[in-house]
UniProtKB/Swiss-Prot annotation:
Residues 473-523 are annotated as: Disordered. It comes from the Eukaryota. This is UPF0508 protein AEL141W. Belongs to the UPF0508 family. It comes from Eremothecium gossypii (strain ATCC 10895 / CBS 109.51 / FGSC 9923 / NRRL Y-1056). Residues 514-523 have a biased composition (Basic and acidic residues).
Amino acid sequence: MAPEKLMHVEQDHQIVLARLEKYLRLGQQCALAVQDPCVLHAFKVEKLGWLARGLAEEHRLMLSRLARAGEAGGCAELVCAWLDGEGGVVGRYGALLVGCADLLFESGMVRYQMRPRSEFLICVLQLYTKLEVLCGALAHDGLAQQLQNFEEAFVARWNRKNMSLLLFDEVVDVLAVDAPFVSPPLFSLDNVVKRDFFELTLPKFGYTQLLVEVFQLDTGEIAIFRVNSERLPYRADQGKRLLRQITSCGEPLTCIGRSLLFSTFRKSDLTVLEEMPSAMHLTTRIDSDVHMVLRAVYQFEWDTFWRCTLHTMFSASPPSLGGIAAIASARRISHPPQNFKIKHQKLAETLCCGTQGLGLQLQPSRPTTHERQLQDAGSDCSMQTSLLPPAPKLLSHAWTAVPEESGEDSQSSSGYDNTPQQLQLFELEDSTSTRGSQNDSSLRLLELADSKRTDSGSLVLQYPSFRSSIASSLHLRSPSPHSEDTASEGSARKRPQPDNGTRNAEHDDFEESFASHKPENMKRRNAYLLQFLNHMRPAS
């Protein structure tokens, strides 16, 4: 390449890079919230701005070197050495191009989005064009590899954008006679189970071999989308062709995405008239003038999936499909209301004549394990309360002794001598009986306080001499059978039987005392408690 032409290329690079750096720098002035997801792309914009500024400065220095070396010649070798130098100019160009492609397709920022007459897109395409010219003039392998990487990345993002953009602005109800525009159904790419390319022929709407994409939804419905670009996706090696089309006319930018043509088709909305090689001739039940022919683009997809799916959806009696079946979503009923309708029709056929409604048989509910345990606990509680008189609630903490009072009032109110002893009550638990038939619940101490000692707050024993015998009777954990039987028989001999006929007429009023309200020895293991209560009786 002549030195003059090479210098002209370097000047163009410097202008394009300065323009790109200015556009990126102005975009950084936009204020963004901290929670805005575009903040992550703002750091990428800042990085790309520094790359563009550094490359523009490198080209300015290179331009001055070319001006000095123009007379001696060897400008091409000088530029190649500069590209392969320690500055990593080629690598920085690759990072700048791929980063700009990410902003175009994945940033979501309006300033950098892929759209017609976008200034950012124009800057990127101009930079790519200038690098392509420089690579052709120098035949530099490293720069050619970076351009190829950018082309492949651009094509991959273009195809993904083209296939993920769904438009619902012109949806026609083909099942209606006048085919009006209707509101579109609500679904997204997450609801798509299978999608493939077909050629649609529909004379009523003027479609002849129109390239469409048929979607199988997770509800079983069929959706037909028009491919706005009217061409199959670009291959990985067609990036140069795509970039040239966008640079020359920009037509691909105006016809990107997919547009829904008709409302989604449910089961039995269409009828199969004829099966053709890799195609299906369909019609509607309402309008016989609607003849739709769907021809698959890929034979393998037709044989493995779509032939079975269309027969299952729209054939009254699906034929044998040679062992190749569709996935489960295609075999089930297409839509929940349609599912209810078909099941209701099947149920109506099984009813007897003159029978309306549904026959229901209700089984009695069985009690759960928790309810049975509650019932058993209630029955045990009622049995225990019937055997023993009700006892007041026992406090588990220790009672403090009442300070000793002087005078006759103190002796008359307490009813005991002047040597009080503090008794600490413990909550006693009965151990499991050694006999299987005597599994008693835990024993409870009765709060021994009559009407004359309700304010004392303590329990004082009158007979200290019995304190040792009472303490020995509280060892309940492992009583021997012999001692238990002996204590039971002795207490039975000592206990006088109450006689209701011998009560004094002067004591007709109710008076709570141990003589008249003594608990019965209903169980043998309560003998030590009766002995304890007998020792606590005041002297009469």
